[in-house]
A protein has these predicted regions:
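An N-terminal hydrophobic leader/cap segment in hydrolases
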Residues: 18-74
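Hydrolase active-site cap/lid region
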Residues: 175-224
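Conserved alpha/beta-hydrolase
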Residues: 105, 112-134
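Gly/Ala-rich beta-loop-alpha elbow adjacent to hydrolase catalytic centers
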Residues: 162, 166-170
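Short beta-strand/loop motif that positions the catalytic acidic residue
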Residues: 237-239, 244-246, 250
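Catalytic histidine-centered segment of alpha/beta-hydrolase-like enzymes
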Residues: 276-288
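Short alpha-helix in the alpha/beta-hydrolase fold that links the catalytic acid
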Residues: 111, 231, 240, 254-261
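Alpha/beta-hydrolase active-site loop
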Residues: 137-158
Length: 309
């Protein structure tokens, strides 16, 4: 099927947010280790690869968190506990929001409020090693399992909205594991998971062989070929409607990865923005309006007005 594509936004030009920097002493030690033991260098880099950054919560997010009904649930498949948040009337249709790496379930204030205004209740969670969910390290697998457990406990969901790691995890949950929300919306998600390992090794100043060792190690942990985590692979297994949103100025994940994912979707739409980057896109009113409209109708706003590109 030919994906349907649209575009929105003319944000001011400027630098978008980039990946969180790694302190130079950590990089220097990793570079040194690889000359003595590639296995040790791989384990060393993996230690940091699996540890998200934690950030202080701003007052607006803190107030939004206080408005939530909060509970902690166990995810038996990974043996960890996650913090769950809920807003809105309990008899309303449900939307699940999945945050990205180093994010929190309480960060989607504007989107959540618009969903509440549209008559939905909103569920979100802090993935392992994020927010209030405890532990210090995590993997994409644990994002996937957290989403599956949310569906088992609180589903079915009208839609799942996932940003970055949360989005690719949601696509895996739908594609490989058969979750059936009515619709899925992804924002700024990667296609190739292998590429992330090589990019991280490059940031650390490590040789590609170190990335390969980590890929092989984590393939054993996941119990699957890492290629089977890819966005395009799971897109081919997905038959529910999916809206893929990506910014052309995203410096962390190039928008060409979104295009690759959409090409494999049976029922996919691509919405490209320009100038919002990897994170500010989540606060853009036009994008939020498109997400809510898509969840309600399965269409983009410009489709209703006959201006689809």
């Amino acid at each position: 099927m030919t994906p349907q594509t649209s575009s929105t936004g003319n944000a001011p030009k400027g630098n978008t947010q980039v990946a969180y920097p790694i302190p130079k002493p950590i990089i220097w030690l990793g570079r040194l280790l690889q000359f003595f033991s590639k296995d040790l260098a791989a384990a060393y880099s993996r230690f940091f690869f699996m540890r998200p950054m934690r950030h202080k919560m701003k007052p607006a997010e803190s107030r939004w968190k206080q408005e939530a009904e909060q509970q902690f649930i166990e995810v038996p498949s990974i043996g960890k506990t996650i913090s769950v948040y809920r807003w809105g009337p309990k008899d309303a249709p449900k939307v699940l929001i999945a945050h990205g790496w180093s994010g929190r379930g309480t960060q989607f204030i504007d989107l959540s409020r618009k969903l509440l205004d549209a008559g939905y209740q909103v569920y979100a969670f802090d993935a392992p090693a994020h927010g209030q969910s405890g532990t210090k390290s995590t993997l994409m697998l644990e994002f996937i399992e957290s989403i599956r457990e949310m569906d088992r406990r609180f589903g079915p969901f009208e839609a799942i909205v996932g940003h970055s790691m949360g989005g690719i995890a949601a696509l895996n949950a739908v594609g490989r594991f058969g979750l059936r929300p009515k619709r899925l919306v992804t924002v700024g998600i990667p296609d190739s998971i292998k590429k992330i390992f090589y990019q991280f090794a490059e940031i650390m100043g490590l040789k590609p062989v170190i990335a390969k060792k980590n890929i092989d190690y984590l393939a054993k942990v996941y119990g699957t070929d890492i290629d089977h985590l890819a966005g395009s692979y799971n897109a081919a297994l997905t038959d529910i409607p999916v809206l893929v949103i990506h910014d052309k100025k995203d410096k962390e994940v190039p928008y060409t990865e979104a295009e690759a994912i959409v090409r494999n979707l049976k029922n996919g739409k691509l919405l490209l923005t320009e100038g919002f980057g990897h994170r500010r896109i989540l606060r853009n009113p036009e994008v939020i309006e498109q997400i809510v409209h898509y969840i309600r109708t399965g269409k983009l706003l410009n489709e209703d007005h006959g201006t689809q590109e």
